[in-house]
């Protein structure tokens, strides 16, 4: 018999700023770099710039998206085109990326900024997949539908 009052519930704070984003991204990329679907496309992160070179750029990106920090300039499309030329990205890559992102956010944070991080990630994944492949992605649509975003 389970006593609901005795079962601890974890309450998470919302993403509050750069330090939280750094922690989130380090955890997320730690998972992505060993994932059986995502590790190959992320080889360049691992081998060329390393995680320590990649994280500040991605932290700038997400801090700009979530907090309007104005730190990220440019477009992520050229980098993804290079990856796509080397390792063709398919719907499964974007669906796994989003699933991993949403799970990582949900395990670490909760609140309106966290929700925005998930909805923006879904929007970016859908748009990037469409730009790279010219196709819709039913698998990604299914992730969005089931991920409460």
Annotate each predicted stretch with a short phrase.
Residues 1-149:
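Core of compact, soluble alpha-helical bundle domains
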């Amino acid at each position: 018999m389970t006593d609901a009052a005795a079962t601890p519930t974890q309450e998470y704070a919302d993403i509050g700023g750069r330090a939280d984003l750094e922690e989130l991204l380090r955890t997320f990329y730690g998972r992505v770099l060993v994932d059986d679907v995502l590790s190959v496309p992320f080889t360049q992160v691992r081998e060329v710039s390393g995680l320590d070179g990649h994280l500040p750029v991605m932290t700038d990106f997400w801090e700009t998206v979530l907090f309007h920090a104005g730190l990220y300039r440019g477009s992520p499309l050229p980098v993804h085109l290079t990856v796509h030329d080397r390792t063709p990205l398919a719907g499964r890559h974007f669906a796994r990326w989003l699933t991993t992102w949403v799970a990582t956010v949900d395990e670490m944070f909760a609140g309106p900024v966290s929700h925005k991080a998930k909805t923006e990630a879904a929007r970016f994944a859908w748009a990037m997949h469409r730009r790279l492949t010219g196709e819709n992605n039913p698998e990604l649509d299914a992730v969005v539908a089931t991920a409460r975003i």
